[in-house]
Amino acid sequence: PSLPGWATKNCLPTLFAENLDIPMSQAGLMSTITIALSSFIGVILGGTLSDKWVQKNIRGRVYTGAIGLGLTIPSLLLLGFGHSFVAVVGAGLLFGIGYGIFDANNMPILCQFVSSKYRATAYGIMNMTGVFAGAFITDLLGKWTDGGNLGLGFAMLAIIVFIALAVQLYFLRPKTDNME
């Protein structure tokens, strides 16, 4: 899921400029505000939902993160193939909410599987892996942009997110909310 996160941070202004035929100065501001505002909303929603759900179901955090990932799938498709202002900006808002919901639950889910003795290391490895993924996807989408296929690249990220969602739901089966 780091791939679409980095893709939006690094390439969404270009996608907005191309798909909406607006200057990059407007596209950069529009994409930054869209993602930042909606991600903040997603973090608040995702954190609140997860904290309540885990009290009733130990997999509540996993399910909350999965809901967030699920929201990013149609938004990536619409970001990639949309050409109207409402479609593209709406998809950006939906992506931000979904990503915020997912992101708010990364550390809480990690706490369900990794002892407090190793959490900083585990989170550091997770972040480092995400940064490497970000470098990879930025380079790849840059090449796709040069070939005129940035939108297709965004849409294809939906496939990767779907696979990550399936893996998360199948394999993440916590036994506690806080591994000691």
Predicted regions and their residues:
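Interfacial helix-cap and linker-helix signal at transmembrane-aqueous boundaries
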Residues: 16-17, 49-50, 54, 141-149
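Multi-pass alpha-helical transporter architecture, strongest
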Residues: 75, 79-81, 155-180
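A membrane-interface helix-boundary motif in multi-pass transporters
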Residues: 23, 60-63, 140-160
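A late C-terminal transmembrane helix in Major Facilitator Superfamily
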Residues: 43, 111-147
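Conserved glycine-rich helix-kink/hinge and helix-boundary motifs of the Major Facilitator Superfamily
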Residues: 28-29, 66, 120, 124
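Cytoplasmic membrane-interface "Motif A"-like loop-to-helix N-cap segments
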Residues: 51-68
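Extracytoplasmic gate region of multi-pass secondary transporters
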Residues: 1-44, 103, 107, 138
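Hydrophobic core of transmembrane alpha-helices in multi-pass small-molecule transporters
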Residues: 85-101
